[in-house]
């Protein structure tokens, strides 16, 4: 059996996804490392590895849909949907102002059990917004997965909101392999 976690760590290292130095994050905060997940989610081998890790965690659960917030999590949700054979949902940051005016692409039915995926979390705030969109539209979040948790509050955010949160890798775990 493939050890997907070690494979993921090696692929992230090989692709220089986690960079160390001085960086300014989108929030304006300074950080001594940067997680370049856009690079990771455009690599088929990384997506395949991530999709297998998530599918292995949910294969015995009664899951109806795999969801991913736009933009970064859509490739993750797509890959996981392909491996798990579960339909996917794409969650927009805001409702469209044209056409069908949807915020969720894909068919979310009342009481669908949904797994949501994300590329990287810091505090978990943006993923929580996507979770609220699903719940406001009748879906039930069963689990939340993230490729890399920066360990800056996401675990606590999800615990406070009674959401099972599983990082495939934490920044502390990654640093051990350097």
UniProtKB/Swiss-Prot annotation:
Organism: Methanosphaera stadtmanae (strain ATCC 43021 / DSM 3091 / JCM 11832 / MCB-3)
Known catalytic reactions: orotidine 5'-phosphate + diphosphate = orotate + 5-phospho-alpha-D-ribose 1-diphosphate
Subunit structure: Homodimer.
Keywords assigned by UniProt, alphabetized: Glycosyltransferase, Magnesium, Pyrimidine biosynthesis, Transferase
Binding residues for 5-phospho-alpha-D-ribose 1-diphosphate: 92-93, 96, 118-126
Keyword Glycosyltransferase set for record: yes
Family annotation (HAMAP family): PyrE
Positions annotated to bind orotate: 122, 150
Needed co-factor(s): Mg(2+)
Gene transcribed to yield this protein: pyrE
UniProt function note: Catalyzes the transfer of a ribosyl phosphate group from 5-phosphoribose 1-diphosphate to orotate, leading to the formation of orotidine monophosphate (OMP).
Cleaved signal peptide residues: none
SUPFAM superfamilies for the chain: PRTase-like
Species classification: Archaea, Methanobacteriati, Methanobacteriota, Methanomada group, Methanobacteria
Similarity comment: family membership: Belongs to the purine/pyrimidine phosphoribosyltransferase family. PyrE subfamily.
Entry superkingdom: Archaea
GO molecular function: magnesium ion binding; orotate phosphoribosyltransferase activity
Biological processes annotated in GO: 'de novo' UMP biosynthetic process; pyrimidine nucleobase biosynthetic process
Matching Pfam families: Pribosyltran (PF00156)
Pathway entry: Pyrimidine metabolism; UMP biosynthesis via de novo pathway; UMP from orotate: step 1/2
Enzyme nomenclature, EC number: 2.4.2.10
UniProt-recorded name of the protein: Orotate phosphoribosyltransferase
InterPro entries for this protein: OPRT, Or_phspho_trans_dom, PRibTrfase_dom, PRTase-like
